[in-house]
């Protein structure tokens, strides 16, 4: 920037405030936000409910087992019973059920045989995803128990 000399002083003052000082009203807002955990408590309850919708739904599908995570918004179901790589099964779900998952192999050799699903979504979308996966598995793997 090459402003007129009269503007340089004003720009320097603005830059100092932007780069090195948090305004008092912002400090007051941050202090207030830290006083209450109500929004955090609600968020934990929401994610717990969503996790349970997804994981309980997945565990009801023959051939899929899934543990409940305690500290993330991801589910990592075991799909080894289908005899497919995680990449193959993820592609099947995308193509045939319209459900996006991440192959466990993307996280290293120990992730093979698993998929990653995120439950940072609405209850309705999670229920729909479980329904689509269950419908696909029932059609494609009718002998799965």
Regions found by a protein language model. Name each.
Residues 1-145:
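PLP-dependent class I/II
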């Amino acid at each position: 920037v090459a402003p007129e000399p009269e503007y340089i002083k004003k720009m320097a003052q603005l830059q100092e405030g932007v780069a090195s000082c948090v305004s008092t009203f912002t400090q007051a807002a941050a202090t207030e936000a830290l006083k209450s955990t109500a929004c955090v408590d609600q968020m934990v309850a929401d994610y717990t409910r969503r996790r349970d919708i997804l994981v309980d739904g997945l565990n009801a599908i023959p051939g899929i087992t899934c543990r409940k995570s305690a500290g993330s918004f991801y589910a990592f179901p075991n799909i080894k019973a289908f005899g497919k790589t995680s990449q193959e099964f993820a592609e099947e779900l995308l193509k045939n059920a319209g459900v996006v998952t991440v192959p466990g192999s993307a996280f290293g050799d120990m992730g093979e045989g698993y998929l990653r699903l995120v439950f940072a979504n609405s209850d309705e979308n999670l229920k729909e995803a479980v329904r689509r996966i269950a419908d696909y598995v029932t059609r494609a793997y009718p002998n799965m128990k």
